[in-house]
From Swiss-Prot:
Keyword entries, A-Z: ATP-binding, Cytoplasm, Ligase, Nucleotide-binding, Purine biosynthesis
Major place of residence: cytoplasm
Enzyme Commission numbers on file: 6.3.3.1
Subcellular location: Cytoplasm
Family: Belongs to the AIR synthase family.
Any one of the GO BP annotations: 'de novo' IMP biosynthetic process
Lineage, opening ranks: Bacteria, Bacillati, Bacillota, Bacilli, Bacillales
Gene3D superfamilies given in the database record: PurM-like C-terminal domain, PurM-like, N-terminal domain
Protein name: Phosphoribosylformylglycinamidine cyclo-ligase
Amino acid sequence: MANAYKQAGVDIEAGYEAVSRMKKHVQTTMRKEVLGGLGGFGGMFDLSKFALEEPVLVSGTDGVGTKLMLAFMADKHDTIGIDAVAMCVNDIVVQGAEPLFFLDYIACGKAEPSKIENIVKGISEGCRQAGCALIGGETAEMPGMYSTEEYDLAGFTVGIVDKKKIVTGEKIEAGHVLIGLASSGIHSNGYSLVRKVLLEDGELSLDRIYGRLELPLGEELLKPTKIYVKPILELLKNHEVYGMAHITGGGFIENIPRMLPEGIGAEIELGSWKIQPIFSLLQEVGKLEEKEMFNIFNMGIGMVVAVKEEDAKDIVRLLEEQGETARIIGRTVKGAGVTFNGGKAL
């Protein structure tokens, strides 16, 4: 039967080898609350140790999108898993939740044990950065659905927060200060446009350094998404945070309003933070308007937090002590949506 299955394109032995290879990476993510080991039908996590008055579970799921195609082109697979974790855990930490565990889903045309190991190595690194356990996953070999070199990657996370400490944004008022945490680069959104502008139309090479980039283009584009969990959880222990936004697809213009109550807008001060050279290269090569850039990309800011003005400097200092680059980038105002430099729309 194994030979028949192999002739159909599914290599069971390769699947077993991939699982064996990934175990050492997964083990590095374990928390004391994890029950059992790899290989069970489901992952188990003991919640009894959390002394919360009204515990609330917060879940999130996401993928890496077409950034995967850059990984295929560069044949580099050991960091794309960090992106998968980041996209999920950053989404739930903005609600005040501590990520507890993570599960991954890898679908591929052909199970290559070394490639699968590298993907899971990255996922495990992301979980360590976020402090969550990788308690399960699925690797599906699907010949005919994907080419032998292709795979898709998605993740799922669950976190916990005391109900009274959920960050909703509903108490944000005009005059609150917006603090931005620097991104590592493009993160994991907008890569369909990135490929069209830089690789298809611009015919740039992944191996060359362009303009003010410090790395070859391929390395720049594959920089992993920053994981903000630990600095944000430390911030929440020490200060009141009124709202947070993870700047993903839709950029500033779509994501900042997601944390704001009705009747409140955001005014952003352009020039108050450093926009990385990769965004300038994209805008120049693609002849993209500034509004389009801010409506697609994070433009150098991966997370925005809303705080009281009197707390802002202390919070910037705390975030900097946690290793983040943090800047005051604007404030909340009466109105709606996002404007720039004195209330102007881009």
